[in-house]
């Protein structure tokens, strides 16, 4: 999550949705017709589909995440909605709490059968993909900023504006609380290393194990960290910084790469695929793809002012980006 947090709150809005069935369909992202080529760089970025995922205004927040099996894409936003899409951009279902509150982030369970959302009202809510609420977590005194599922029924972890990181069992019993300086903003979990990475707005990354033990604190000079992503093997961490850089760290905390993405503005989101290609989105509205040597391989400017989130499909060839006003764009690396 990468965010200028909002001070407003959506109150009194009631939304109901039709009970459509969730169809587990194989995504057609690999076979989708190519709309257009957007550059002539070493990596081509082909637009598959662009659509209005959410209707957002002002300093909005939008996040996108693919499911582990690659069949679905989850979008969450400060309009108070989470939306489940097929991987080729067809809407399956909308989720809204009661009362509706802005959603700062979300995540799929490892098996893709549930999602969890992080609410401005301090509530983390767990849903099945049919839209039923399975439970609510009410342990924070301020906004929930991010949420992750752990593996093998180990529970979930939440982070918050109140500076705490909290672990919860599958029956929503508290397992641990870790307090860190500042706001804990963004998280990622890697099943290979069994580690949780949590960013703080003072430029630190806290590495935890599922028992809540702090394994390492990595200090950066990026200022507020807007996003963090593990490499697939869990050996590398990529961060998006307030200072306009993306950085790559190993688990010992050593910085192995600094990418100067832009001179004036934030890097708002990062993602890394299994080939260690790094995608960045930023305040200047440009998606860029880099290698681990820091070389720019390709870029795409959708002319949407600011981009807020990026996610690689598990196949490593497709990716999705989201703009602050709610547009979602699906692309393929060529």
Swiss-Prot record:
<keyword id="KW-0677">Repeat</keyword>
<feature type="repeat" description="WD 5">
    <location>
        <begin position="262"/>
        <end position="291"/>
    </location>
</feature>
<feature type="repeat" description="WD 3">
    <location>
        <begin position="139"/>
        <end position="169"/>
    </location>
</feature>
<dbReference type="GO" id="GO:0030288">
    <property type="term" value="C:outer membrane-bounded periplasmic space"/>
</dbReference>
<feature type="repeat" description="WD 2">
    <location>
        <begin position="98"/>
        <end position="128"/>
    </location>
</feature>
<keyword id="KW-0853">WD repeat</keyword>
<protein>
    <recommendedName>
        <fullName>Uncharacterized WD repeat-containing protein slr1410</fullName>
    </recommendedName>
</protein>
<dbReference type="InterPro" id="IPR015943">
    <property type="entry name" value="WD40/YVTN_repeat-like_dom_sf"/>
</dbReference>
<feature type="repeat" description="WD 4">
    <location>
        <begin position="220"/>
        <end position="250"/>
    </location>
</feature>
<dbReference type="InterPro" id="IPR036322">
    <property type="entry name" value="WD40_repeat_dom_sf"/>
</dbReference>
<dbReference type="Pfam" id="PF00400">
    <property type="entry name" value="WD40"/>
</dbReference>
<feature type="repeat" description="WD 1">
    <location>
        <begin position="56"/>
        <end position="86"/>
    </location>
</feature>
<dbReference type="InterPro" id="IPR001680">
    <property type="entry name" value="WD40_rpt"/>
</dbReference>
<dbReference type="InterPro" id="IPR019775">
    <property type="entry name" value="WD40_repeat_CS"/>
</dbReference>
């Amino acid at each position: 999550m990468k965010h200028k947090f909002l001070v407003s709150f959506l109150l009194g809005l009631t939304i109901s949705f039709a009970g459509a069935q969730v169809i587990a369909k194989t995504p057609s992202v690999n076979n989708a017709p190519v709309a257009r080529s957007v550059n002539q760089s070493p990596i081509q970025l082909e637009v598959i589909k662009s659509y209005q995922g959410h209707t957002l205004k002002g300093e909005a927040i939008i996040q996108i995440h693919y499911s582990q099996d690659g069949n679905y894409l989850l979008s969450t936003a400060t309009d108070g909605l989470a939306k489940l899409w097929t991987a080729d951009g067809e809407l399956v279902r909308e989720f809204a709490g009661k009362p509706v509150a802005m959603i700062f982030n979300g995540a799929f369970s490892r098996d893709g059968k549930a999602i969890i959302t992080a609410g401005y009202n301090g509530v983390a809510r767990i849903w099945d993909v049919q839209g039923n609420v399975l439970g609510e977590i009410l342990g924070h005194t301020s906004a929930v900023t991010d949420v992750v599922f752990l593996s093998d029924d180990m529970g979930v972890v939440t982070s918050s504006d109140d500076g705490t990181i909290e672990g919860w069992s599958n029956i929503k019993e508290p397992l641990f609380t870790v307090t860190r300086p500042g706001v804990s903003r963004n998280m990622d979990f890697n099943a290979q290393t069994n580690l949780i990475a949590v960013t703080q707005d003072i430029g630190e990354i806290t590495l935890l194990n599922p028992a809540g033990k702090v394994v390492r604190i990595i200090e950066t000079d990026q200022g507020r960290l807007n996003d963090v992503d593990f490499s697939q093997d869990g050996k590398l961490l990529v961060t998006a910084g307030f200072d306009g850089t993306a950085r790559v760290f190993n688990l010992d905390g050593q910085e192995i790469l600094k990418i100067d993405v832009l001179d004036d503005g934030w890097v708002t989101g990062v993602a890394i695929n299994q080939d260690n290609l790094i995608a960045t989105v930023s305040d200047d509205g440009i998606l860029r793809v880099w290698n681990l040597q820091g070389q720019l391989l390709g870029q795409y400017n959708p002319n949407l002012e600011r981009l807020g989130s990026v996610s690689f499909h598990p196949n490593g060839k497709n990716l999705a980006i989201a703009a602050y006003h709610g547009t979602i764009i699906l692309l393929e690396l060529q």
